[in-house]
């Protein structure tokens, strides 16, 4: 039984880490193109308009926004499915196991946001980016852990993943409450009706995924038109997908609709959606930039929040709880592992880029460049230091 249980965990980390490495490659390729003679073609590609029409109804957006509003809704659907499964029967179903990563995640969101606020408190326009350094990119972080192989205990990977899950919950709440534009009540009513239908389907024992996905698509369009960020539709839909299916006979085993959909989405999200997102959002053109671009309060605040704030928040909040005897480190984890994980939490990348696109969507191009500079620098330094710390942990063991 023990061997069977280890397979899904092993498959999860193999897929997440491989996706993280592909994410790094996609981001590097975008930066390479943006700083090459082909940068015009890159800009033209991400700004290419795509239209979806049905009768009088039409949606027209550039590729960049289709990626951020559409593909990322599928990513958040997967995040929601993982959250529901973890809360019902996974690591997050045991309060004793979730307390320490939950505390770490809270510290890892509060301290970076405070550092960013302190650096940008005199710049009202920049303050809208306070949540950018509060995010953690689990795929990127696990990609770094993959480079360490067996040097890192599995408990360390599970602990990092648990922190990232709570981080995702925080990011979802932040997007819902702080990055919502003007509300269209009619579209919001349509979205609410979709939620009601999804609830009825769930309570009535409907297990056909097509029904949920079709209603979810209508809800996504309604949210897109309502002013509430459409990616939240993915999370809402996920929590209505049934965990179990009714058995026509006790001996007949019916697969879980939620687990089936989660399994089907993992590969497309890891190997297609997130790399496309990274490619579309990472094309920073360094040519022509001056010192003032790198020392602007926005990139400095983001980089400081990710690098200093994340490690300080996660390590300090967890450390205090362990030292006072309120909580315990997971079995097989040492203080150096906790610090290494805290540093890796500073890899914000895709989630930070996404929140940044919402925070500065009304601003000019300079704000966008400033935001991405800080994210890339803070994430890169966190990745390098986290790798060094965890690699040295094995040598000292």
Swiss-Prot record:
Keyword annotations of the record: Antiport, Cell inner membrane, Cell membrane, Ion transport, Membrane, Sodium, Sodium transport, Transmembrane, Transmembrane helix, Transport
InterPro entries reported in the protein's UniProt record: Na/H_antiporter_dom_sf, NhaA
Sequence intervals crossing the membrane: 18-38, 63-83, 98-118, 129-149, 158-178, 181-201, 207-224, 269-289, 306-326, 340-360, 373-393
Entry keyword annotation includes Transmembrane helix: yes
Pfam name, any one: Na_H_antiport_1
Superkingdom as given in the UniProt entry: Bacteria
Gene Ontology CC: plasma membrane
GO molecular function, one term: sodium:proton antiporter activity
Catalytic activity: Na(+)(in) + 2 H(+)(out) = Na(+)(out) + 2 H(+)(in)
Membrane topology (UniProt): Multi-pass membrane protein
GO biological process, one term: regulation of pH
Keyword NAD: no
Localisation per UniProt entry: Cell inner membrane
Gene3D superfamilies per record: Na+/H+ antiporter like domain (1.20.1530.10)
Family, as annotated: Belongs to the NhaA Na(+)/H(+) (TC 2.A.33) antiporter family.
PANTHER family: NA(+)_H(+) ANTIPORTER NHAA, SODIUM ION/PROTON ANTIPORTER NHAA-RELATED
NCBIfam families: NhaA, PRK09560.1, PRK09561.1
Purpose of the protein: Na(+)/H(+) antiporter that extrudes sodium in exchange for external protons.
Protein's UniProt name: Na(+)/H(+) antiporter NhaA 3
Organism expressing this protein natively: Saccharophagus degradans (strain 2-40 / ATCC 43961 / DSM 17024)
